[in-house]
Regions:
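Short, aliphatic-rich beta-strand segments
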Residues: 46-51
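Conserved histidines in hydrophobic membrane contexts and catalytic metal-binding motifs
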Residues: 31
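Catalytic DNA-binding helix-loop module of base-excision-repair DNA glycosylases/AP lyases
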Residues: 34
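Catalytic core of pol beta-like nucleotidyltransferases
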Residues: 1-28, 37-42, 53-104
Length: 104
């Protein structure tokens, strides 16, 4: 039976998301921005915060691949942001509104 995860304006098949995250060694994936707040417009992208498992050796090709695969899965352009790369100025607000989509 297919289980769907609904977070704000984003709906995704849980099994597909879990498989994708496992393939890319994702520790946590969270939604933030307009989609998390329920304020998406037809032209909005989806902002996603990612944290990889500590032993992951993710390079730029893998990062771009994850972003593309998430875009395909969600049916929209995805803006993928590394949790470790968050600028101090926005870190608190992003983490406050982040809605967990996946955790390993």
């Amino acid at each position: 039976m297919q289980r769907t995860l609904q977070l704000g304006d984003v709906q995704v098949d849980e099994r597909s998301l879990s498989d994708l995250c496992g393939r890319y060694r994702v520790r946590e994936l969270s939604l933030f921005g307009s989609a998390a707040r329920g304020e998406m417009r037809p032209d909005s992208d989806i902002d996603i915060l990612v944290e990889f498992l500590p032993d992951s050796a993710i390079d730029l090709v893998d990062y771009a691949g994850l972003m593309l695969d998430l875009s395909r899965l969600l049916g929209r352009k995805v803006d993928l942001v590394s949790k470790n790369g968050l600028k101090p100025l926005i870190r608190t607000s992003v983490l406050a509104e982040a809605r967990l989509m996946y955790a390993a």
